[in-house]
Amino acid sequence: ETDIPYCIPAGDMGAQEDWCPENSSEGFKGMITLKSALANSINTVSARLMHRVGPQPVINLIDKLGVDTENIPAVPSIALGTPDLSLFEMVSAYSAFANKGVHVEPQIVSTIVDKNGTVLYQSVPKAKDIISQESAYVTVNLMEGVTQYGSGARLRSGAINNYVYNNVVTGHPYMFKNPIAGKTGTTQNQSDGWFMGMVPNLVSGVWVGGDDRSVHFPSITYGQGATMALPIWAVFMKKCYEDEALNISQEDFERPEDLSIRVDCSQPVEGERQEVELPDELDF
């Protein structure tokens, strides 16, 4: 993809006026891989991709992933996370990617047992194949870039000398070594900060914000998901790993056999066709 100024004209895909998203950082990077663009929250690339796919197929897919789509408009700006979603919905949707394309409906209560040990209620998970194992793996691989060299790199040793993170109460650096896929998120005016994180057998998320969106950080330095929400996720995961009884995975995400999609696009392959035709529907 290409990180250059990009506009979707009024009337196209439900846009009421020309929509020209900007990046949080100044300037543009030119040619960039989709993985790197996602890792660094390059909005122009997300807009370009949405323009190619269209918002309605995206809405159809997330509906199958447990998201209430009734009030989500079919407009291109949803590519930047404009809909109001609950943390419950986000964890539900992300779990399908970690679970090899299978969505399992989350349960608040799994079992009810009386004082004698008799099981009064046992939930039966509702599982459904939503996307292919290959598509799920590629999505996870894309999001691994976020914690490897993107906005979530401080989970490892990234930003180790950044003054913003020095002496914070949550501890830094976090120095995770295991594979982690994730995504930071920041809403308009720094009113909300998100971090969603995945390891092979656990999906968890953190939202920081308030009911009154007029209460927010004055700048993105402290008001972004990487500084508001990610540290809480890091502390939570460290506690999870300290409890060996939880058996939280530190292994790689399982790669499907005969993977047909090349996940390392940093170097073009000689003779490979650069433009591909998009399917009529997303993979569901």
Regions found by a protein language model. Give the residues of each.
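Conserved catalytic neighborhood of penicillin-recognizing serine enzymes
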Residues: 1-58, 103, 114-145
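Extracytoplasmic/periplasmic beta-strand context in beta-sandwich domains
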Residues: 4, 76-78, 107-110
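Structured DNA-binding interfaces in DNA transaction proteins
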Residues: 10, 81-82, 106
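Extracytoplasmic/secreted cell-surface and envelope-processing proteins
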Residues: 10, 71, 214-218
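Mid-domain, small-residue-enriched loop/turn segments at the edges of structured enzyme/sensor domains
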Residues: 14-23, 54-92
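A penicillin-recognizing enzyme superfamily signal
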Residues: 36-40, 86-274, 282
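Short polybasic/polar patches that bind polyanions
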Residues: 51, 63, 98
